[in-house]
Amino acid sequence: MSRTIYLSTPSGAGDHLLESLFKEAKKEERKDRRLAVSIRLEDLAVHITNSDMTGKEAAELLRREATRFENESQELH
């Protein structure tokens, strides 16, 4: 036996709930992006150290990585 439950919300409350859900989703997305960038930077630091890169080589690697991030950003828009 199944029952259907109807919830009543005050007028406008649905909009507020939806807005809250969007804000929470954006916050989670930003948190995930920050974690991904942090992990990538750590990987680059390990690579630079293990490869005994010079400062100039490390700077070039960081420039290429910055270009990659920029290109990914443009693909999303």
From Swiss-Prot:
It comes from the Viruses. InterPro entries: DUF2732. It holds the Pfam family DUF2732. This is Uncharacterized 8.8 kDa protein in GpA 5'region. It comes from Escherichia phage 186. The lineage of its organism: Viruses, Duplodnaviria, Heunggongvirae, Uroviricota, Caudoviricetes.
